[in-house]
Amino acid sequence: MKAIITVVGKDRTGIVAGVSTKIAELGLNIDDITQTVLDEYFTMMAVVSSQESQDFAQLRKEFEAFGETLNVKINIQSSAIFDAMHNL
């Protein structure tokens, strides 16, 4: 399983630490990650994978709820869907 996680919100200390910890807790591996701060806004994109099959609906709920605790918006989607949506 391969997926794309995006995180957007007002910048503050601990976002990367919190999100990467949650990723590990859910049994996902970070294959690639990038983040930047634009003005006062934090953005991050991570490519994650798992050898195990994952329930995307459950992962989405977990990340959405966790994002609320960090005051950021976290989205996860299958890399195949992400690629299809962003194919030029």
Swiss-Prot record:
InterPro entries: ACT-like_dom_sf, ACT_dom, UPF0237/GcvR_regulator, UPF0237_ACT. Gene3D superfamilies: 3.30.70.260. Signal peptide: none annotated. Residues 4-77 form the ACT domain. PANTHER family: UPF0237 PROTEIN MJ1558. Homodimer. Belongs to the UPF0237 family. This is UPF0237 protein SMU_72.
